[in-house]
């Protein structure tokens, strides 16, 4: 029978000093026999996805206490990728994932907490906390802040839905007046919550449902809706029950590594491919698998992507569908239900809320549910009022979207495409693979051959695009922006948005060892591995070369003879300490980022740290 971890600092005569400090936090005599539950919150006033979380940790804490536990809240950092986008701030985004994971580990282990509630939401916070939960392997549950309502604006006598990407694209479109751009800017992000499309934050919060670590609706019920409060309350009650099951009944099935197995990662990437999730999810799932000790690789993602259909298309893949529309169609449980009926899901796996996923689907999949409360839950609608307050409205749709032939969520027979929304490409320029979000690529350019235009940084590429140096048929190559080469693996949302604003969204491709925002669409191929800074062939590409892209056959090829590439590699290696570094790039890299770069790996392993580089 495992002992409560907290007894290390609460039991015995020698812990009198520690207990004195615990008492100073408000603990009483009777509390020292209870499970101590850590609440990792991520409130910050910098990030709209987190601005409403300030009081939600204490909401969970009160529920933990009512269920017989002791709650102790702490906070992590949170970087807003949208605000950090397009300047040096983006260098810090991916490294913040490791800091978040480490900070959760530090706090939980230093204070010997028994279990963990993760209150996350945006791009690197959910992955960082997921990595920490799997690293710690104590009872854990996730509850996110929820998605933002989609923006609305009246445009040419018609009301259209908006999101962050629309503001970026229109701002770079010279045909849009200042007044039009201002109207979009003021309407694109109307409420608190994670940005409203199937971008990275929402993708990751949806994937926690598939992994079995969060409650139904976690990925889709709006931050502003009153229904979301119940997720926080249920999370507080559930985590105390999980702690007692593990420590008092020796039930290890509640531990993260018991729930998030190889098959659970298969479920997660199956959902990801089916819903056309952000390419960043691949990076984060690979990193999480490493923490879980699960041998889940790019090869597994490639295998799954070939057999899973695309059942759902959400912005940026389509302009008029957002997460609130996915919720109305039954949310993630509805997509998982369709995947299960197609024989593509491991439904026998446990979750934090049900004995098996199959049991959960029998209750929560609207196509097989019988409980009217479930139907009402998925009718939760946007309030349409700008606000930064959680649970501030209770509007409902009159009816659900149950149309599986032409609706937001499709069944397999009526899938958008029979191949899924993400694909892994391999070739001589990406021997360890690269990722493309096929859900956002027009099928007319699934095969594409173009002339290479080489840029040594995102900034240089933006200058080239806005300076009209890119024409139809070009392939923009941005290198030395990987985890090590950036460092920090910047997102390339501005270059792709500017290509769209120039009318080149279906006429050009972009290839990088960096990554893309979940808001990216078009023929945008990222995560090229090995990256240029690690000796990858993308570092050998020259201006005017030709690259062949073949998504149906999962192939990408630099059309240069092998002997020429061999000669280029020899010439590069002959540069000594200047080899595999960007020529002419002026970029200040702080000591913190240099430390990250020294340990990080390429995207094919999740951009995780390799501590063997410093082990003696």
UniProtKB/Swiss-Prot annotation:
Gene Ontology cellular component annotations, sorted alphabetically: cytosol
Positions contributing to Mg(2+) binding: 81, 123-124, 491
Cofactor note: Binds 1 [2Fe-2S] cluster per subunit. This cluster acts as a Lewis acid cofactor.
Record-level GO BP terms: isoleucine biosynthetic process; L-valine biosynthetic process
Catalytic activity: (2R)-2,3-dihydroxy-3-methylbutanoate = 3-methyl-2-oxobutanoate + H2O; (2R,3R)-2,3-dihydroxy-3-methylpentanoate = (S)-3-methyl-2-oxopentanoate + H2O
Enzyme Commission number(s) from the entry: 4.2.1.9
Record's protein name: Dihydroxy-acid dehydratase 2
Gene behind the chain: ilvD2
